[in-house]
C-alpha cells in the first residue's frame, strides 16, 4: 500500500476537486490517504490563485516538501489547481524537483500521470481544458458527515477585470443534469442531508438532459428537492447578472432551499462596478433583493466586497458603506484589492497606499460585524431547525450544528441526534455563533 498526502487551498470547488482526486487514486492506484506529509509516497498541492502572492505561497510550500524528497527521492510531488493552470512549466523552472503539474480540468488524468513518472522519472504536465472530461471519470466520493458540496458547473464567461477564474477554470461548462442528480442520490444513500451546489457562476447552470433538452438552474433546484433524504439545499457562488425571476420563484415554492443567499456585489459604487466590468448597477442588485424579500420575507443576504480597487475614491468607498447599510447584509467576505497577473485591472493605476486600503477594510468589516450582531440578536428566543453535525470541540456535553443562515449553534443533547434535524430555541447570541436548548 502506498500513501498520498494532499494539501488544499482556496474555494469549495478546490475542496470538491481534492475529494475527487482522493477517490480516483484510492480506486485506480490503490493508494491510501495519510495525514502526515513525511509518510507519503505522493505529495499533492491543490492551489488557489485568487489572492495576492498565491504563487509565492506555492513555492514556499514546495520548498518545505523538497526536504522530504531529499530524504526519499522516490517521493512524487504533484502541483494542481489554479496556480498550476496559470503558471504551467514555470513551476518546474523554479522547483525542478516537482514531478507532475496538472490543471483544474485534468485532475482525472492524475493516475496515468503518476504511472508515467514512476516509469520514466521525468516531468509530466497537462494543463489543458478538455470540456467536462473529468466528470466522465466520476466516482462518487465517500463523504463523512451529513453535508456535501456538489460541483454542477465550472468556469465563467464574465471576464470581470480583476478576476483570474476564466483563465484558470475556463469558460462556463455545465454538467449533465442527470449526472448531478445521480451523484446527489448516491450521497443521500450515504446519509447526506444537506447539499451545496457549487459553481464559479452557479446560477448560470444550463445542464443538458438525456432527452436533449436543457435543465436550467431553477429546475435543477426543484429536482434536487425531490430526492429522498435531501432536506436542505444551498448554492454558491451566484452572480447578480444571472439571478433571474425564475430563480426567485424557487424561493416561493421550494422550502428545502435555505433562507440564506450569498450574492457577491463587490462594490456599492456604480463607477467602480463599471471599472470592474461587473455589468450591473447597485440599482439592479437592489431590485433583486427586493424581489427576493417578497418571495422569502425572512431571507438573509451575504456578499463579497473588494476595497481599494484602482480608481476607488473616498466618495466611492462611502457609497459602498451606505449600500451595505441599505441592503442590510448579514455577513460578507471582504478583501483588499490585489492585482492578479494577466487581468485587465492589473494594468490600471493602483495609487492608493496600503495603509488607506487597510483603513477602509477595517471600517467595512466593522460595519458588517455590527449588522451581523443585529441579525443574531433577532434570533434570540426563536426556534431554529438545526442539522446536528457532531459533538462540540469546546464541550463534550454539547452538540453542534448549523442553522439555515449558516450560524453554528451549540446545545445539550444525545449523540443519537447526530445527523438529524432538531428544533433548538436560541437562548444566547454571539456575532457568528449561538447557544440554545432543544425545543
UniProtKB/Swiss-Prot annotation:
Its predominant location is cytoplasm
PROSITE patterns registered for this protein in UniProt: MTTASE_N, MTTASE_RADICAL, RADICAL_SAM, TRAM
Which positions in this protein are listed as binding [4Fe-4S] cluster 2?
Answer: 156, 160, 163
Iron among keywords: yes
Q: What class of enzyme is it?
A: transferase
Positions of transmembrane segments: none
Keyword line: 4Fe-4S, Cytoplasm, Iron, Iron-sulfur, Metal-binding, S-adenosyl-L-methionine, Transferase, tRNA processing
This protein's GO cellular component annotations are: cytosol
Q: Which residues bind [4Fe-4S] cluster 1?
A: 11, 48, 82
What this protein catalyses is: N(6)-dimethylallyladenosine(37) in tRNA + (sulfur carrier)-SH + AH2 + 2 S-adenosyl-L-methionine = 2-methylsulfanyl-N(6)-dimethylallyladenosine(37) in tRNA + (sulfur carrier)-H + 5'-deoxyadenosine + L-methionine + A + S-adenosyl-L-homocysteine + 2 H(+)
Q: What is its EC number?
A: 2.8.4.3
Name the InterPro entries for this protein: Elp3/MiaA/NifB-like_rSAM, Methylthiotransferase, Methylthiotransferase_CS, Methylthiotransferase_N, Methylthiotransferase_N_sf, MiaB_methiolase, rSAM, rSAM_horseshoe
Q: What function does the entry list?
A: Catalyzes the methylthiolation of N6-(dimethylallyl)adenosine (i(6)A), leading to the formation of 2-methylthio-N6-(dimethylallyl)adenosine (ms(2)i(6)A) at position 37 in tRNAs that read codons beginning with uridine.
* Family per record: Belongs to the methylthiotransferase family. MiaB subfamily.
This chain's protein is named: tRNA-2-methylthio-N(6)-dimethylallyladenosine synthase
Native source organism of the sequence = Buchnera aphidicola subsp. Acyrthosiphon pisum (strain APS)
Amino acid at each position: 500500500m502506498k500513501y498520498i498526502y494532499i494539501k488544499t487551498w482556496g474555494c469549495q470547488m478546490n475542496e470538491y476537486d481534492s475529494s475527487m482526486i482522493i477517490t480516483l487514486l484510492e480506486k485506480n492506484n490503490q493508494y491510501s490517504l495519510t495525514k502526515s506529509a513525511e509518510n507519503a509516497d505522493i505529495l499533492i498541492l491543490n492551489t488557489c490563485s485568487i489572492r495576492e502572492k498565491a504563487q509565492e505561497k506555492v513555492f514556499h510550500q514546495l520548498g518545505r516538501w523538497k526536504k522530504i524528497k531529499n530524504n526519499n527521492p522516490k517521493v512524487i510531488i504533484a502541483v494542481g489547481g489554479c496556480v498550476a493552470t496559470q503558471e504551467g512549466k514555470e513551476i518546474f523552472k523554479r522547483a525542478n524537483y516537482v514531478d507532475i503539474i496538472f490543471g483544474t480540468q485534468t485532475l482525472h488524468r492524475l493516475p496515468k500521470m503518476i504511472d508515467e513518472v514512476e516509469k520514466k522519472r521525468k516531468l509530466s504536465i497537462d494543463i489543458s481544458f478538455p470540456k467536462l472530461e473529468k466528470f466522465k471519470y466520476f466516482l462518487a466520493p465517500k463523504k463523512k458527515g451529513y453535508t456535501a458540496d456538489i460541483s454542477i458547473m465550472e468556469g465563467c464567461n464574465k471576464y470581470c477585470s480583476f478576476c483570474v477564474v476564466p483563465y484558470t477554470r475556463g469558460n462556463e461548462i455545465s454538467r449533465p443534469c442527470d449526472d448531478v442528480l445521480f451523484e446527489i442520490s448516491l450521497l443521500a444513500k450515504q446519509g447526506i442531508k444537506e447539499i451545496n451546489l457549487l459553481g464559479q457562476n452557479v446560477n448560470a447552470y444550463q445542464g443538458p438532459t438525456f432527452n436533449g433538452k436543457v435543465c436550467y438552474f431553477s429546475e435543477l433546484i426543484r429536482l434536487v428537492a425531490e430526492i429522498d433524504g435531501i432536506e436542505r439545499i444551498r448554492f454558491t457562488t451566484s452572480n447578480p447578472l444571472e439571478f433571474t425571476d425564475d430563480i426567485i420563484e424557487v424561493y416561493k415554492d421550494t422550502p428545502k432551499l435555505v433562507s440564506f443567499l450569498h450574492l457577491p456585489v463587490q462594490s456599492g459604487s456604480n463607477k467602480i462596478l463599471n471599472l470592474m466590468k461587473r455589468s450591473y448597477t447597485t440599482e439592479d442588485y437592489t431590485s433583486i433583493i427586493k424581489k427576493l424579500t417578497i418571495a422569502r420575507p425572512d431571507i438573509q443576504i451575504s456578499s463579497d466586497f473588494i476595497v481599494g480597487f484602482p480608481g476607488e475614491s473616498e466618495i466611492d468607498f462611502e457609497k459602498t458603506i451606505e449600500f451595505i447599510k441599505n441592503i442590510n447584509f448579514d455577513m460578507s467576505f471582504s478583501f483588499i484589492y490585489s492585482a492578479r497577473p494577466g487581468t485587465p485591472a492589473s494594468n490600471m493605476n493602483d495609487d492608493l497606499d496600503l495603509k488607506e486600503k487597510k483603513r477602509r477594510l477595517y471600517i467595512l468589516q466593522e460595519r458588517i460585524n455590527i449588522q451581523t450582531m443585529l441579525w443574531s440578536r433577532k434570533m434570540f428566543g426563536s426556534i431554529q431547525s438545526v442539522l446536528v453535525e457532531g459533538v462540540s470541540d469546546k464541550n463534550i456535553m454539547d452538540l453542534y450544528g448549523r442553522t439555515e443562515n449558516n450560524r453554528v449553534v451549540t446545545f445539550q443533547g444525545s449523540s443519537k441526534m447526530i445527523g438529524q434535524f432538531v428544533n433548538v430555541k436560541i437562548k444566547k447570541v454571539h456575532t457568528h455563533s449561538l447557544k440554545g436548548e432543544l425545543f
